[in-house]
Amino acid sequence: MQIWVDADACPKVIKEILYRAAERTGVLLTLVANQPLFPPRSLWIKTLQVPPGFDVADNEIVRRLATGDLVVTADIPLAAEVIACGGHALNPRGEFYSTENIRELLNLRDFMDTLRSSGVQTGGPAALTQADRQVFANRLDQFLARIVSD
């Protein structure tokens, strides 16, 4: 099992939580982005730079994903592909995507895209709060504790 990160849009504070978790648990963490990344040096942390382009990083994550891997992403279509491939998907606010909620989230995303394309100002997501960071760290720790103990 390893952790994949859709790193282009992943907040720095979430990456820092992931770095610490990889070091603590010995679980391989791979950050995938279309720009250079400079994580701390570690046996457990790798980067994978992909060419620029629409969904190139997402496609590379899905291509390399193994059943049971964890993907950290806010990209709902990527999360849907991860779930379909037998992986786990967690967003930076600590919410797991699942077979039970992914369809509704995709529909909501498509609806918001339709609103935006018709000129409605929908705004973006709120900034991550300290509580969001704590929820993410707790859910990640719970997930890794289950995986590492198995």
Swiss-Prot record:
Origin: domain of life: Bacteria
InterPro entries: UPF0178 (IPR003791)
Pfam family, one: DUF188
Coiled-coil regions listed in the entry: none
Entry-linked PANTHER family: UPF0178 PROTEIN YAII
Protein family: Belongs to the UPF0178 family.
Protein's recorded name: UPF0178 protein AZOSEA36080
